[in-house]
């Protein structure tokens, strides 16, 4: 019937069945419905520069605008940038400079929603699940079909479900450099300010569809208007003093010390209300919902302060020594765990400067080096994780006819909350020859990350709260990297032809060496669960032994009830998973490293043997460059919603794929 109606234009692509419901016989390409073949954009740039020995300046501006890729919905993006930089040499020993960046962005994006929520669904997912080719966009009377509403196309066309963002960024840095003793003692200081303001407006409207001449539905089941504002500020300052004494031709010494301070502020407010009266003009005065949500959607302040130093020494450019360190404090940690010291050191020997290499004129540089260095990471998401906080909620019960507020259970405080510390041990080799044309560099390293910020031991259910994050794990990363490059130039037709090529290869693996939580829960596609001894990126799954050849074989195989939905039965053509532990069931046990049933490691998602190739050629003002990047090995398993990969088998087998859960 479908083929007959599509081959003969005299037949309608729809009919009303005996239940008074539309039946469709379309051949709709929903990608053509939604997407343009191309989109357009334009940008304009302007810059002005000038000055002399005493003062110089640079000012640039950019305007960029691009239309969206959808055939409806008026998607648009606009951006304006202005950058200004000025330098003034007030005195031969005093230099002042200032840099200001301003950026303004505006975006209008049509959205699709399955419920009264400002979290939109992605178009690709809605097309995957709701865009049936046999379905039509509109009914014969011009009303929307269910597919048109469920995919979001109706909202795109009517243009009243959208998200509009307007963002402003201002970044200013002022720096002063004072040459106290010319080329010997130099002081420098700077102060910077960053401000970001984001205003977001969102409208969610409902759309009516008809499944028959007299039957209709609505999606979403209501409407909502929301306004959010985000405000971010950062003030930072630093100062350094560098001492470089003159010690003769054989010795070179540099000593630098300084401090820095950073202060961050974040504020977010939200206001929303349901019941849009006029879909094209959402406004809080034109909403009929009874409840209006007004709340502080997250506000915090936090800061960093630190002191640092670096001492570098070189003897005849042959033996190289360097020591450095930082002492940092972070307001996100409790007072007794707030500070951390992170030292580093390195040594190097330029073999090419040794006496026995003096006659190797082809060799420019040959250096071996070793280093050990530590760095602290204090960028945890919660600025007040060291405080036990209690949320305030509103009871659903009445007290004298009114609802009342109550406090929820206080949040637990982790035993240890301090800096993550990453210590890297590195051995390296640098080689340069033939007047800098040939270069080779290689490193092998081990990085030990201690006090990782992760979820701690699972708490008993009677505790009434989830386990807090803290410093509960350590990790070891082993890796190497190498690069080889060649560059040269020749005369071609009286003009210089220059070319270059560079190949780089690198690899690393990471393993959890300590984890205080002993639950041993296996990782999945949607959550990273650590256990001691785990290699990062592990994928666990069932071992497959082909497909069932008959229904009888499927029914007499191991028990599949662990991942059988409703009354479904396994039959010929379904995958045949192995019962590896011989208990008669194919399942994941307790889904832990101690009891994983028939699960085995089937791969690893970590990219391995990554590589890049860069090259370029330039002649007579004409140039071409290229860059290739790749991964030598990586295991990948698509998620259960990857409909473009799984097709109609995406959800039927999702219960049988533990990596999905």
Which functions belong to the PLM regions below?
Residues 604-637:
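Glycine-rich, aromatic-lined ligand/substrate-binding cores of catalytic
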Residues 1-21, 270, 489-605, 645, ...:
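Conserved small-residue
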Residues 2-29, 43-45, 116-155:
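Acidic, glycine-rich flexible loop segments
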Residues 42, 85-104, 112-113, 124, ...:
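Extracellular/periplasmic, surface-exposed regions of secreted and cell-surface proteins
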Residues 43-69, 83-89, 97, 175, ...:
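Predominantly transmembrane beta-strands of Gram-negative outer membrane beta-barrel pores used
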Residues 1-73, 113, 176-177, 556-574:
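Residues embedded in well-ordered regular secondary structure
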Residues 5-7, 21, 155, 289, ...:
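Extracytoplasmic gating/loop element in the C-terminal half of outer-membrane beta-barrel translocons
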């Amino acid at each position: 019937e479908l083929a007959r109606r599509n081959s003969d234009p005299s037949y309608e692509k729809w009919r009303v069945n005996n239940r008074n419901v539309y039946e469709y016989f379309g051949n709709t390409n929903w990608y053509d419905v939604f997407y343009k073949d191309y989109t357009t954009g334009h940008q304009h740039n302007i810059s002005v520069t000038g000055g002399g020995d005493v003062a110089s300046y640079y000012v640039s501006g950019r305007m960029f605008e691009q239309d969206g890729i959808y055939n409806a919905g008026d998607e648009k993006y606009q951006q304006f940038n202005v950058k200004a930089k000025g330098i003034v040499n007030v005195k031969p020993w005093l230099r002042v400079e200032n840099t200001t960046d301003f950026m303004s962005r505006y975006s209008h994006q049509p959205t699709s929603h399955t419920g009264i929520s400002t979290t939109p669904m992605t178009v690709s997912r809605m097309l995957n699940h709701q865009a049936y080719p046999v379905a039509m966009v509109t009914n014969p009377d011009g009303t929307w079909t269910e597919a048109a509403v469920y995919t979001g196309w109706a909202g795109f066309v009517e243009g009243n479900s959208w998200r509009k963002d307007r963002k402003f960024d201002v970044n200013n840095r002022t720096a002063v450099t004072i040459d106290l003793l010319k080329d010997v003692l130099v002081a420098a200081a700077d102060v910077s300010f960053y401000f970001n303001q984001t205003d977001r407006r969102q409208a969610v409207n409902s759309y009516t569809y008809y499944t028959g001449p007299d039957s209709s539905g609505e999606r979403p089941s209501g409407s909502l208007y929301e306004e959010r504002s985000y405000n971010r500020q950062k003030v930072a300052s630093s100062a350094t003093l560098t001492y470089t004494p003159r010690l003769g031709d054989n010795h070179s010494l540099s000593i630098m010390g300084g401090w820095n301070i950073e202060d961050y502020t974040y504020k977010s407010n939200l206001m929303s209300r349901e019941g849009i009266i006029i879909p094209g003009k959402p406004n809080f005065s034109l909403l009929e919902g009874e409840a209006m949500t007004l709340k502080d959607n997250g506000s915090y302040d936090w800061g960093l302060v630190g002191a640092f130093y670096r001492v570098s020494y070189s003897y005849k450019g042959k033996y190289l020594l360097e020591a450095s360190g930082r002492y940092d404090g972070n307001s996100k940690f409790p007072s007794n765990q707030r500070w951390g010291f992170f030292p580093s050191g390195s040594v190097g020997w330029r073999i090419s400067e040794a006496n026995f290499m003096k006659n190797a004129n082809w060799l420019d540089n040959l250096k071996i080096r070793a280093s050990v260095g530590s760095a602290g990471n204090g960028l945890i998401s919660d600025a007040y994780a060291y405080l036990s906080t209690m949320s305030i909620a509103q009871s659903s019960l009445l007290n004298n006819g009114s609802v009342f507020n109550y406090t929820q259970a206080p949040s637990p405080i982790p035993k240890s909350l301090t800096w993550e510390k990453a210590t890297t041990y590195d051995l390296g080799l640098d080689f340069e020859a033939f007047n800098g044309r040939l270069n080779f560099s290689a490193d092998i390293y081990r990085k030990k990350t201690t006090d990782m910020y992760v979820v701690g031991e699972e708490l008993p259910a009677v505790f009434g709260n989830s386990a807090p994050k803290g410093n509960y794990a350590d990790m070891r990363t082993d890796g190497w990297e190498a690069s080889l490059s060649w560059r040269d130039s020749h005369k071609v037709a009286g003009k210089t032809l220059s070319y270059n090529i560079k190949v780089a290869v690198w690899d690393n693996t990471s393993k959890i060496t300590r984890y205080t939580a002993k639950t041993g829960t296996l990782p999945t596609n949607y959550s990273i669960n650590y256990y001691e001894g785990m290699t990062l990126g592990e994928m666990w799954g069932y071992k497959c032994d082909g497909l069932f050849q008959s229904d009888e074989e499927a029914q007499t195989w191991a028990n599949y009830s662990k991942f059988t939905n409703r009354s479904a039965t396994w039959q010929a053509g379904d995958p045949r998973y192995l019962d590896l532990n011989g208990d008669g069931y194919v399942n994941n046990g307790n889904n832990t490293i101690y009891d994983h049933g028939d699960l085995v490691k089937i791969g690893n998602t970590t990219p391995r043997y990554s590589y890049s190739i860069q090259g370029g050629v330039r002649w007579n003002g004409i140039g071409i460059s290229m860059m290739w990047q790749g991964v030598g090995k990586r295991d990948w398993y698509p998620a259960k919603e990857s409909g473009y990969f799984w097709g109609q088998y995406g959800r039927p087998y999702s219960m049988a794929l533990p990596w999905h859960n």
